[in-house]
């Protein structure tokens, strides 16, 4: 029995069309809360034995073909506001990273590193996303979240344990807002920088294909702040190339010919195709270099019960 809500609660909702890779089975339930009060009330009344899984726009996610035995919580309107208050940029967890970068730039504040990061602010904080030498950890002041028990809490960035592509946000907590500190900048200059970033991305990454962004973490040096050495020679794509896996295929899944650290759905791929190809890449890279790549794409859910 699910608690009453003012938002939308759907049983057996397929998730494939909510992910960038367009694969995956159904969630037991999909909850799209109307606002913070609706979200908090639902979590407070929800059976603690039933898992919850916060989901953004599915940009960094493989949902397995058997679906997800959980309540998937997907924030939308009511959670995507953006405002600038002096040096602070406050964004709802459902705000797109690109929109936050643009809104900040219009106000003369520099969060340009977010412009080419796919997904939402909630996911960017949870994964300590970064680009062009800047990371969420470098700018984050604090976050607001709803706990699994339905309590609203505010946490300083230092309490999140932000590191390279990870955080220690407790399982089941739902981020609702994040505040960033952003340096001042000329709006026109910031806009030009973002245009250059987009051009650079589009010339080197398969942005026209169905992908989930970078597939594996770079095995480069990094510190507890999340800063990575972007000039480090040890890049995941180089290791993949050296293992002969650029362009490798399994079913409808392929390691992109354009950028070999991008796993793409060429059409008709299953989650098993995509994850299986990724695991084969890990195996081949380890055989070639002795280095074990780590997934950057999150994989969740179960295999189909009738899997042979």
Curated annotation (Swiss-Prot):
**What does this protein need as cofactor?**
FAD
Q: Which EC numbers does the record give?
A: 1.3.1.98
SUPFAM superfamilies named in the record:
FAD-binding/transporter-associated domain-like (SSF56176), Uridine diphospho-N-Acetylenolpyruvylglucosamine reductase, MurB, C-terminal domain (SSF56194)
Q: Where would I find the FAD-binding PCMH-type domain in this sequence?
A: 22-185
Q: Which cysteines are joined by disulfide bonds?
A: none
Output the GO biological process annotations, alphabetical, semicolon-separated: cell division; cell wall organization; peptidoglycan biosynthetic process; regulation of cell shape
Arranged from A to Z, the UniProt key words for this protein are:
Cell cycle, Cell division, Cell shape, Cell wall biogenesis/degradation, Cytoplasm, FAD, Flavoprotein, NADP, Oxidoreductase, Peptidoglycan synthesis
Which is one Gene Ontology cellular component term of this protein?
A: cytosol
Which residues are responsible for catalysis?
165, 214, 296
Q: Which reaction does it catalyse?
A: UDP-N-acetyl-alpha-D-muramate + NADP(+) = UDP-N-acetyl-3-O-(1-carboxyvinyl)-alpha-D-glucosamine + NADPH + H(+)
What this protein is reported to do is described as:
Cell wall formation.
The family assignment reads: Belongs to the MurB family.
The entry's protein name is UDP-N-acetylenolpyruvoylglucosamine reductase
